[in-house]
Amino acid sequence: MSKAILLDKKLQQSNELALPERYAQIKEHNLYLYVKSYLSSLRANSASAKKRGEVSGGGKKPWKQKGGGRARAGSITSPVFVGGGVSHGPSNDKNYTLKINKKQKRLALECALFQKAQEGKLFVVDSLAMPSGKTKDAYAMFKALKQRSTLFVAQMSDEPTFLAFRNLQQCYLADANELNAYLVAAFRSVVIEKAVFDEIIAEKKGE
């Protein structure tokens, strides 16, 4: 059974918190689908080329049909002309969004947390509050964890706490309502407040 590591105020291991057994039964394909959907939603569909009907001009036949010794042509917007339309070029009317349902999102998050717990990279603390708002205090916590890139998850971060974590390059502070499977998978380790952890564990499968 995979377990999260409970840390005390000195960031030393004090206990272990078991994850529900059903987490082990979740297929990794749910995580794959969510990450694919998340990244596709970030894709900027900006590549575009004008077709021959979208290029300006071309209303007049460039030269007469016969007698010129040149190939016949009906419009300068033809793809064979410089400045003409593009055949089979990229279009910005394509929608890359991939939708998944609420249950799959939930399963993906549970799968990501389970994987972090298996790796021994899921930590639980009582609070992440940084009343001082100083980066050095947040860095001291990060350094004490002896981890690499770390996702911190708070129930609801206040402004001082947000400011304390903002400038740390290998860290990211997320609120509970911002937490998703992609964020969990993107960082090497996850530090989550116990209140948030308890809420996640208490929720039923797929809800």
From Swiss-Prot:
Q: Which UniProt keywords apply?
A: Ribonucleoprotein, Ribosomal protein, RNA-binding, rRNA-binding
Q: Which InterPro entries match?
A: Ribosomal_uL4 (IPR002136), Ribosomal_uL4-like (IPR013005), Ribosomal_uL4_dom_sf (IPR023574)
Q: Name one Pfam family in it.
A: Ribosomal_L4
Q: Which domain of life is it from?
A: Bacteria
Question: Keyword Ribosomal protein on this protein?
Answer: yes
Q: Does the keyword Ribosomal protein apply?
A: yes
Q: An example of a Gene Ontology BP annotation on this entry?
A: translation
Q: Which GO terms describe its cellular component?
A: ribonucleoprotein complex; ribosome
- Give the transmembrane region(s): none
Chain positions covered by the region annotation Disordered: 49-73
Q: Which family does it belong to?
A: Belongs to the universal ribosomal protein uL4 family.
Query: What role is this protein assigned?
Result: One of the primary rRNA binding proteins, this protein initially binds near the 5'-end of the 23S rRNA. It is important during the early stages of 50S assembly. It makes multiple contacts with different domains of the 23S rRNA in the assembled 50S subunit and ribosome. Forms part of the polypeptide exit tunnel.
Protein name per Swiss-Prot or TrEMBL: Large ribosomal subunit protein uL4
Q: Specify the species.
A: Helicobacter hepaticus (strain ATCC 51449 / 3B1)
Its taxonomic placement starts with: Bacteria, Pseudomonadati, Campylobacterota, Epsilonproteobacteria, Campylobacterales
